[in-house]
From Swiss-Prot:
InterPro entries: Glyco_trans_1, Glyco_trans_4-like_N, Glycosyltransferase_grp1. SUPFAM superfamilies: UDP-Glycosyltransferase/glycogen phosphorylase. This is 2-deoxystreptamine glucosyltransferase. Glycosyltransferase involved in the biosynthesis of kanamycin by mediating conversion of 2-deoxystreptamine (2-DOS) to 2'-N-acetylparomamine using UDP-alpha-D-glucose as sugar donor. Can also accept UDP-alpha-D-glucosamine, but with a much lower activity compared to UDP-alpha-D-glucose. Pathway: Antibiotic biosynthesis; kanamycin biosynthesis. Its EC number is 2.4.1.284, 2.4.1.283. It catalyses: 2-deoxystreptamine + UDP-N-acetyl-alpha-D-glucosamine = 2'-N-acetylparomamine + UDP + H(+); 2-deoxystreptamine + UDP-alpha-D-glucose = 2'-deamino-2'-hydroxyparomamine + UDP + H(+).
């Protein structure tokens, strides 16, 4: 989500939209960075004890962000007057509270981008999450009804929210995750360097990948099970895991317990400008997500010419399902997902032809400049309504 926010913020800055982005950030980054003339990124995170969480990474991380972000709003309201507050929702409680409270503090309306909605696609991630799910769902409904506008990543979620909110919310627009089609596919030299760096086969054995946050909702357990099924079938391959997350140690332990350590390569976090080389290097991207609002990684992979084998959940039905529908497996069906990967490896030509045919649609629908234009139109619509 943070990659998408930064990409969209930069595109909006090019269109002349002045922005102050308040984000939890990553350790080691500067507290304030002027990214461009119209874009300032501020890390807002109150001090908190380093207690590990298998959901957020650190216990209290979201609360620490909210407290610091609201404090920053108070500081900014006089020296940097804003027209609108934009909040990005991830299905968790604290971001839902940010919009209404910040809007009151600053005295301007707020709009929200729904990256993950409990009303539409979200699936609880733990016992505690299941217990609090009805409460957080109610808070989401409350926050969305009070927003001056809403953007969703898909028509699917927009339709659900329109039905849920009714006349209380009339400004709902679709602004999908954005990619840069011109940079989606890496040059052969970049791919070769990446393969050499991580000890991947230069030729011959296929590379299957998992790219993203290593957390429950991304379905990493299903990825390990699918790899086990492929290994049992005698397939020769390397499985590349790109990314980090609160459950990385759990995934590594599960891989070792399954006797698959020699099949896996973990890269840890990689900068976003290295992802095109990753996607181009893969023969198949595996996305066994439990829930997925859109699935920007799938779009990036397909634009790089890489097939995506995924569960048919959320927005993956609208991306993978439109371009290569035969690569969607029923949610939770690991054996079917493994068979899908095997089919692509055995006979990639039909799927690659579908990807070539679908590239123009992907570039038009998810290109960053197109998405930024939609976002700007949404802001103008919201402010026109408010004024």
């Amino acid at each position: 989500m943070q990659v998408q926010i930064l990409r969209m913020s930069r595109a909006l800055a090019e269109l002349g939209v002045r922005q102050q982005v308040l984000t939890v950030g990553f350790p080691g980054l500067p507290r304030v960075r002027r990214d461009s003339e119209n874009l300032v990124v501020r890390i807002t995170r109150a001090p908190l004890p380093r207690l590990r969480s298998r959901i957020t990474g650190l216990v209290g991380l979201n609360q620490a962000w909210l407290a610091a972000a609201l404090t920053e709003c108070v500081k900014l309201r006089r020296r940097w007057p804003a027209d609108l507050i934009q909040v990005h929702l991830d299905g968790q409680l604290w971001a839902l509270l940010a919009g209404p409270v910040a809007a009151r503090l600053v005295g301007v309306p707020y709009t929200v981008t729904v990256h993950c909605s409990r009303l539409a696609v979200y699936q609880p991630m733990s016992t505690v999450d299941r217990i609090q799910h009805p409460l957080v769902t109610a808070v989401e409904r409350w926050a969305l009804r009070r927003a001056a506008g809403i953007t969703t990543l898909t028509e699917r979620t927009a339709t659900v929210l329109a039905a849920e909110l009714g006349a209380a919310q009339r400004v709902i627009d679709v602004v999908p995750d954005a990619v840069d089609p011109d940079r989606a596919e890496a040059a052969p030299a970049e791919v070769e360097r990446l393969k050499k760096r991580f000890g991947l086969p230069q030729e011959g054995g296929p590379v299957i990948g998992f790219v993203g946050r290593i957390a429950h909702e991304k379905g990493w357990r299903h990825a390990v099970q699918a790899v086990a099924e492929l290994a049992d079938a005698g397939r020769d391959f390397t499985f590349l895991v790109v990314g980090d997350g609160p459950q990385r140690a759990d995934m590594e332990a599960a891989v070792a317990e399954a006797g698959l350590t020699d099949r896996f390569v973990f890269t840890g976090f990689l900068p976003n400008d290295e992802i095109p080389a990753v996607m181009t290097a893969l023969d198949v991207l595996l996305m066994p997500s439990v829930h997925e609002e859109l699935g920007g990684s799938a779009v990036e992979a397909m634009l790089a010419g890489t097939p995506v084998a995924a569960y048919g959940v959320g927005g993956l039905c609208d991306t993978v399902g439109k371009v290569t529908p035969s690569l969607l497996a029923a949610p939770g069906q690991v054996a079917e997902l493994a068979r899908t990967v095997k089919r692509v490896l055995d006979d990639p030509a039909p799927v690659l032809a579908e990807l070539r045919a679908g590239r123009e649609w992907l570039a038009d629908e998810f290109g960053v400049h197109h998405a930024a234009g939609l976002a700007l139109a949404h802001y103008e619509r919201v402010l026109g309504k408010e004024r």
